[in-house]
Amino acid sequence: MELLRTVSDTKRTFYALHTRPINTIYRRVVEELMVEMHLLSVNVDFSYNPIYALGVVTTFDRFMQGYQPERDKESIFSAICQAVEQEPQRYRQDAERLKAVAQSLPVNDLVAWLSQANHLQQDADLQAQLQAIASNPNFKYSRLFAIGLFTLLEQSNPDLVKDEKQRTEALKTIAAGLHLSDDKLSKDLELYRSNLDKMTQALAVMADMLTADRKKREQRQQQASTPVAPPNE
């Protein structure tokens, strides 16, 4: 019998793949995403789908905004995916494909498609996935899947997701069509949006601190380089 990989196994693999240190403010983001993906990957009811992939990519990209050095971000993302035995390129490609589909559709058509009220021909694979989700009583819902749905709506019509009434109605329609809990979906997305706001605020504070620190260093350097006049005899 094959032993299930543990969270410790996944973390060990990640840090073997990405050996550079991760900035403190982002380490929690990376580890929480990695643990969430790990727990899903070992769940018997979980199966990969492109909406989940879009949620993973969106979560990583949004919460890693401002990360320095910038060149390390793709290495970190790749290591997260490989640590849970997934292909990072598949996640990126599926996410880009779904965003392009969402951008090409009026939001009402997108909601009707996601809720399976209408079957559109834009993406046969996504259509098959949506049908499979709607007909699977054991579908493993996740916060990352919810973020994928939210991102699709956001890509189709950014104004809709900013309007609470329209956003709530769209999510309820989609949840009903896919047989998901609309209460769980809404709560997960409220938490996601709240955490994004907190991260934005934390980054702003950090940027202010760095600016203040840089100004102090410049002042010290300027003072050190200013010649001291000899005392008058």
Swiss-Prot record:
One Gene Ontology term from the biological process aspect of the record: photosystem II assembly
Record flagged with keyword Coiled coil: yes
Protein keywords: Coiled coil
Coiled-coil positions: 183-205
Listed Pfam families: ThylakoidFormat
InterPro entries with a match to the protein in the record: Thf1
Keyword match Coiled coil: yes
Region (Disordered): 213-233
Top-rank taxon: Bacteria
A GO cellular component entry from the record: plasma membrane-derived thylakoid photosystem II
Function: May be involved in photosynthetic membrane biogenesis.
Alphabetized PANTHER family for the sequence: PROTEIN THYLAKOID FORMATION 1, CHLOROPLASTIC (PTHR34793:SF1)
Entries under HAMAP family matching the protein: Thf1
Family membership noted in the UniProt record: Belongs to the THF1 family.
Descriptive protein name: Protein Thf1
UniProt source species: Trichormus variabilis (strain ATCC 29413 / PCC 7937) (Anabaena variabilis)
